[in-house]
Structure formats: C-alpha cells, structure tokens
C-alpha cells in the first residue's frame, strides 16, 4: 500500500485551511484512495507539540540524534510515507513558522520522494507566494516537488467549516476537479517512485 501524508501547515485555531483540509479528508481522499489504492494520512502539526528546533547540529549532519518521543514520532511518520501533500497559507510572502520549524526537524525522510504543494488564501491570490517559498525549502531536503502548485482562492466562499463545498460556491466544480487531480497526481508519482526507487550512480560501471 502506498502512503501519502497530507500535512496542514497552519496551527491557527481559525485557520481557513482547516476547511480545505477537511474537504480533502472527507470528500476527495476516499474517492481517489479507493480507486488508486492509496492511503492518505491526514496530519496536523499541533498533534506533535514540537518545540522550536534546538539541536546543536543540522539533522542531515547528525546521525546520532537523540529526540524526544513526540519529535521522533514526527520523523517516523514522515519516513513511513511514500509521498506528501503540503497545504500552506502565505505569511508575508513566506510560510508559517510552525511549518518551517517542523520541516527543520527533517533530514533525509523525504529524499527522492514526491511532494505536492497546495497553497490557499481567502483572496484570489490563493497564497501563491507561500507555495513558492515552500518549494525552495523542501527542494533543499531532496523532496521531488511536482511542478505545478495547486492554488485555492476564496476558501470561505467555496468551502464550509465542516469540509463541504457550499451550495452556492462560485468555483465549486472547478476546485473539486482540481483537487481530485491533485490527489490523483501525487498518488501516481508516489506509486511509481516507490516501485522504482532511484538507484545511486556507480562510477565504476
């Protein structure tokens, strides 16, 4: 079974991203998961209670890490996945500190695994600068970031707080199709790369 982690990148109690997150969890993931034999694991960062990153060495240079149980759980959950969806808003043309901090704990868990970015906002700009900023961060850690960011604007005009498309959603059909394609795309590449992992180049050949 292929596992894809869906990660909400905001811990704000009133984050409108929760509406999008719940919509994916309740409406879209069951459709794509059953058809494509994908398990989508929905993750909120507040479940890990991560402190600000405080290790003496960068994780990629520290094979002897000693982590607290909650920190190790985050690492283990990311290691177990075959692909990722990051859902992020835009904060001052970047990403939330809580998301950057969680990523800073990672070393090689996402290396050569596919990642899809969904950016969102309550404006038509759809958090696009947050998505682009996130791309640079996860590329540094070796994630294979899929080229096109899925942008979702006017969230509260289209999605209810409990994760349904509103009856009068101005872009409901458009976002339904777009998000179905997003989950199908990450599922496709996760399956391909899990079944055919990259083989390190042997210079002696």
Predicted feature descriptions by range:
Residues 98-105, 141-144:
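Short, electropositive alpha-helical surface patch
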Residues 154-170:
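Short helix/strand-capping connector loops at secondary-structure junctions
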Residues 114-156, 174-177:
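Short, glycine-/small-residue-rich phosphate/pyrophosphate-handling segment
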Residues 4, 40, 112-115, 145:
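Hydrophobic/aromatic residues located in beta-strands of well-ordered beta-sheets
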Residues 84-86, 113-116:
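Short, surface-exposed connector motifs at secondary-structure boundaries
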Residues 1-88, 93-100, 108, 167-180, ...:
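N-terminal beta1-alpha1-beta2 submodule of the flavodoxin-like/Rossmannoid cofactor-binding fold
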Residues 108-111, 140-143, 192:
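Alpha-helix capping at helix-to-loop junctions
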């Amino acid at each position: 079974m292929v596992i894809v982690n869906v990660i909400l990148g905001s811990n704000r109690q009133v984050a409108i991203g929760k509406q999008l997150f719940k919509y994916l969890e309740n409406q879209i993931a069951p459709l794509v998961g059953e058809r494509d034999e994908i398990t989508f694991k929905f993750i909120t960062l507040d479940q890990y209670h991560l402190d600000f990153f405080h290790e003496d060495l960068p994780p990629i240079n520290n094979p002897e890490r000693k982590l607290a149980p909650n920190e190790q759980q985050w690492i283990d959950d990311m290691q177990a996945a075959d692909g990722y969806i990051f859902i992020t808003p835009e904060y001052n043309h970047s990403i939330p500190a809580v998301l950057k901090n969680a990523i800073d704990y990672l070393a090689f868990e996402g290396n050569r695994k596919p990642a899809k970015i969904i950016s969102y906002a309550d404006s038509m700009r759809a958090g696009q600068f947050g998505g682009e900023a996130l791309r640079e961060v996860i590329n540094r850690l070796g994630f294979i970031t899929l080229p096109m960011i899925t942008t979702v604007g006017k969230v509260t005009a289209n999605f209810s707080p409990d994760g349904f498309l509103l009856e009068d959603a101005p872009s409901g059909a458009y976002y339904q199709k777009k998000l179905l394609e997003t989950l199908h795309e990450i599922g496709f590449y996760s399956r391909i790369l899990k079944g055919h992992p990259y083989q390190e180049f042997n210079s002696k050949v």
